[in-house]
């Protein structure tokens, strides 16, 4: 016999037990099968330092839905999990712990001992996010869990670095890079976030060396002027072109610098003359190369002014700015100051201002790599969903700069380069060298810098599959992966780099589709952040409402590429949906006497209606899933379960379930159970826990719902005529119920309905449903053109019928109209009070936003009530 479900669904008790059952039976394992098509996903590896946040929860849910869907469709499915070593984030975390607990810095320990601490920290805390992901129900193959600094990934990183270096695609050189003085490391262009900040334009007078006058420049960064080695003007600028070739005096430093002509200068911006600081501005650097200007760096790694800054040496860059502006003013060089808002580069990690400065770093030469990465997207080999992100990606790749890959950290993949102490030659080797390949010297010093974290992440789709072992069975079966699910905020950080790395190392795209999702924002549309204190812990939501409710909340209404707002109230609504499914399933089981589900040959009208509806749902949901329209699919499943199955079909079958005819009872049970099981399959990828728990209690074939066959559209369940017929009956019953409710007619009061319709057959078949669901004492069906005595009757119209109800005998119209008038007057009085508040500008300005929004919502409710009362009164006056 079938199991009995408890009266109340308790997700906290069910979820951990179900997940353990799946794990114990290797349900998540990806197994190569030559008879099956492969479907593979590699998880964007969360930081090993991390805790699950709403972005992770959405990301994991989307990937899990796709993986479960494909697994049920019969694909060999593999979802590879893993974590990222997260260079800066992890090092900062461990350094902070070291400082707080022991009062030490990493330098006190030394590199080797410090790295031992980081590995120990990783072993202690690194599994935390994995356990949190499991609570979300993710069906990863945990036996394949990877780490971006594990042995396999480290081997792939070293092989890639050496290959690119040997091809001339990695080089070391001095260029302008983004430097974070707080994290004390270089950053790539993608790691710089630009923030609009208020600032100033300072107009400074540079005297001409020949004493014939001066040239005025405008700058937002006077603190770099000690490193000025020229002033540039546009050669087409009539105001300045006579000065080209002359020299001027750098104020404060009293150094002669040349005036050069370059079209980089924008006529009309500021004064038209621009100070050139090649060591601290990428554009100035390029101008400097064209005019052979000296490069003088004045800002040190820690953001202070260095020895080239004269008397400002040792000052913080912004303290220097204040002091310098004061000195310029006192010495008569400051012409004027204007407020000016401009974009300032900030570090994506610590959000401090980034300093552009000249530095010797390691770079990846991007132009040759970008060509193939652009081609595979342009020709459709890789598709972006939504398609609009294709343009975002192409625009970035077409304008990409060389990638700065060296970081001044200890935690990470140490660059495999050794400097010869004798001749200075750089030895880049797959295995640690013992002597210089150029001069044979035995004394080599290893590069101290590590690689950008994203360098190892860029190899993730193939390093997790066994590369650089090209004979790897995993690599040959699962690569390229099927889809990459990620947020639009890391298209440049990660997606682009995976694409060019895959094309360069594998000569094949790393994935076929890039499925982009947006950010999860708070209910006001703000980005969740610690500073705002508006973050919502997904684990708290899962604990309170169940992981299924959280997952469904994140998916319903979510559309690819768009940000979504998270409403806690919606979690509660989704928990109610779980309860609705649970209670419906309990009802079905309480009425089950069958041990095996088989659809009867003879189907009733309501059976054909629900089977036809289900058939359409299967086709549409499958199409939506294939098109990555997961939010649309989930909404359709929700509507079908709540409206069609629970609110209607269960009610429509109750006459048969209570019948004295055993065959009628069994037929109803079979259809109820069949539709429930097929619907649970459709819902399973979205709500895996509750669906598995219910399915296990129902008559079923196979061991697990998650491994069962995905429903398929079946022509034999197309019943368009019956579906339309049943729909007309449902529409009529709905309209009758609404009118009875408006007129306060108790459900217990039976009414004789007269139905005037051209569709007599449908309504005749539906008479039993009117009796049960519309409190009908009797139903008379007449042709649409038949004469009707409407005296004392209320008319309800639908698209297929006119329905007459003799409610005069049931309702005291005079008394009911008086009640309605009184209720309406009270509602109008309340509405007037609220509208007075909302028209008061003082209230709108001073009251909290939540209070104002609450007042607006109350006003809308009262307007709706007044409209409903008017409709009820009008119906009685007909």
Regions found by a protein language model. Name each.
Residues 2-236, 260, 277-290, 294-309, ...:
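N-terminal, positively charged nucleic-acid-binding surface of large information/translation enzymes
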Residues 6, 10, 14, 54-58, ...:
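Catalytic cores of large soluble enzymes that bind and process phosphate-bearing ligands
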Residues 35-43, 65, 101-105, 130-137, ...:
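Active-site-adjacent bridging/hinge elements
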Residues 55-67, 83-84, 153-156, 214-329, ...:
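Structured ligand/cofactor/substrate-binding pocket environments in proteins
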Residues 100-116, 383-384, 539, 560-572, ...:
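Short, polar/flexible loop-turn hinges at active-site or ligand-entry regions and domain interfaces
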Residues 183, 253, 350, 421-423, ...:
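Short Cys/His-rich metal-coordination motifs, predominantly Zn2+-binding knuckles/fingers
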Residues 203, 395-455, 459, 504-547, ...:
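Feature 926 captures the class I aminoacyl-tRNA synthetase adenylation module centered on the KMSKS loop
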Residues 329-349, 433, 437-449:
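Short acidic, Pro/Gly- and aromatic-enriched capping/linker segments at domain boundaries
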């Amino acid at each position: 016999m079938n199991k009995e479900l408890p009266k109340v669904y308790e997700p906290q008790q069910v979820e951990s037990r179900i997940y353990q059952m799946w794990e114990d039976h290797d349900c998540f394992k990806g197994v190569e099968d030559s008879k099956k098509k492969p479907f593979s996903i590699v998880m964007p590896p969360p930081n090993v330092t991390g805790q699950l946040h709403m972005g992770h929860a959405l990301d994991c849910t989307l990937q899990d839905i796709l993986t479960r869907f494909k697994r049920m469709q019969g694909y060999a499915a593999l979802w590879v999990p893993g974590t990222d070593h997260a260079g800066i984030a992890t090092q900062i975390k461990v350094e902070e712990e070291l400082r707080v607990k022991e009062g030490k810095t990493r330098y006190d320990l030394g590199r080797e001992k410090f790295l031992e601490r980081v590995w120990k920290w990783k072993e202690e805390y690194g599994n935390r996010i994995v356990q949190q992901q499991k609570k979300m129900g993710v069906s990863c193959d945990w036996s394949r869990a990877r780490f971006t600094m594990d042995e396999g990934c480290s081997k792939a990183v070293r092989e890639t670095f050496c290959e690119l270096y040997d091809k001339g695609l990695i080089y070391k050189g001095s260029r302008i890079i983004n430097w974070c003085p707080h994290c004390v490391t270089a950053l790539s262009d993608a790691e710089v976030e630009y923030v609009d900040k208020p600032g100033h334009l300072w107009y400074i007078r540079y005297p001409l060396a020949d004493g014939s006058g001066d040239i005025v420049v405008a700058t937002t960064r006077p603190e770099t002027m000690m490193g000025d080695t020229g002033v540039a003007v546009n050669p087409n600028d009539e105001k300045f072109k006579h000065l080209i070739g002359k020299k001027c005096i750098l104020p404060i430093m009293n150094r002669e610098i040349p005036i050069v002509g370059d079209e980089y200068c924008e006529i009309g911006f500021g004064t038209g003359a621009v100070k050139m600081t090649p060591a601290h501005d990428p554009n100035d650097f390029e101008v400097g190369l064209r005019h052979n200007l000296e490069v003088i760096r004045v800002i040190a790694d820690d953001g202070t002014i260095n020895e080239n800054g004269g008397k400002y040496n040792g000052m913080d860059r912004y303290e220097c700015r204040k002091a310098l502006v004061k000195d310029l003013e006192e010495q008569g060089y400051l012409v004027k100051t204007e407020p000016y808002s401009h974009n300032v580069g900030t570090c994506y990690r610590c959000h401090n201002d980034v300093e552009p400065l000249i530095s010797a770093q390691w770079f990846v030469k991007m132009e040759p790599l970008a060509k193939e990465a652009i081609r595979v997207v342009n020709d459709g080999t890789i598709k972006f969903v939504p398609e609009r992100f294709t343009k975002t990606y192409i625009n970035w790749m077409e304008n990409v700069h060389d990638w700065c890959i060296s970081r001044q950290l200890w935690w990470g993949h140490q660059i495999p380069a050794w400097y010869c102490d004798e001749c200075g030659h750089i030895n880049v080797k797959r295995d640690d060298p013992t002597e210089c390949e150029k001069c044979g010297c035995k004394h080599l010093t290893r590069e101290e810098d590590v690689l950008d974290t994203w360098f190892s992440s860029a190899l993730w789709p193939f390093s997790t599959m066994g590369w650089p072992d090209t004979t790897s069975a995993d690599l040959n079966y699962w690569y390229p992966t099927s889809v990459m699910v990620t947020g639009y905020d890391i298209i440049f950080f990660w997606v682009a780099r995976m694409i060019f790395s895959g094309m360069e190392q594998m000569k094949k795209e790393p994935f076929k589709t890039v499925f982009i999702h947006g950010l999860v924002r708070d209910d006001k549309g703000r980005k969740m952040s610690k500073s705002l204190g508006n973050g919502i812990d997904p684990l708290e939501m899962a604990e309170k409402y169940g992981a299924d409710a959280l997952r469904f909340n994140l998916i319903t209404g979510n559309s690819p590429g768009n940000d979504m707002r998270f409403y806690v109230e919606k979690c509660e609504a989704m928990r109610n949906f779980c309860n609705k499914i649970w209670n419906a399933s309990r009802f079905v089981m309480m009425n089950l006497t069958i041990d095996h589900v088989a659809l009867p040959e003879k189907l009733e009208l309501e059976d054909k209606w629900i089977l036809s509806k289900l058939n359409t749902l299967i086709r549409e949901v499958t199409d939506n899933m294939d098109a990555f329209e997961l939010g649309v699919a989930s909404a359709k499943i929700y509507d079908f379960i709540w409206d069609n199955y629970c609110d209607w079909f269960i009610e429509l079958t109750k006459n048969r379930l209570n019948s004295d005819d055993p065959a009628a009872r069994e037929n109803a049970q079979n259809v109820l159970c069949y539709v429930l099981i097929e619907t649970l399959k459709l819902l399973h990828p979205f709500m895996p826990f509750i669906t598995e728990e219910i399915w296990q209690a129902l008559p079923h074939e196979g061991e697990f719902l998650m491994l069962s066959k995905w429903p398929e559209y079946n022509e034999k369940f197309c019943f368009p005529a019956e579906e339309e017929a049943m729909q007309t009956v449902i529409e009529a019953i709905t309209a009758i119920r609404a009118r009875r409710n408006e007129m306060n007619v108790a459900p217990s009061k039976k009414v004789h309905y007269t139905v005037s319709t051209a569709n007599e057959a449908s309504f005749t078949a539906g008479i039993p449903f009117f009796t049960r669901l519309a409190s009908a004492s009797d139903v008379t069906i007449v042709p649409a053109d038949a004469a009707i005595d409407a005296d004392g009757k209320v008319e309800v119209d639908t698209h297929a019928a006119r329905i007459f109800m003799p409610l005069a005998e049931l309702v005291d119209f005079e008394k009911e109209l008086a009640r309605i008038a009184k209720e309406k007057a009270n509602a109008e009085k309340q509405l007037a009070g609220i509208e007075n508040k909302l028209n008061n500008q003082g209230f709108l300005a001073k009251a909290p936003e939540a209070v104002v929004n609450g007042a607006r919502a109350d006003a809308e409710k009262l307007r709706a009530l007044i409209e409903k009362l008017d409709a009820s009164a009008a119906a009685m006056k007909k």
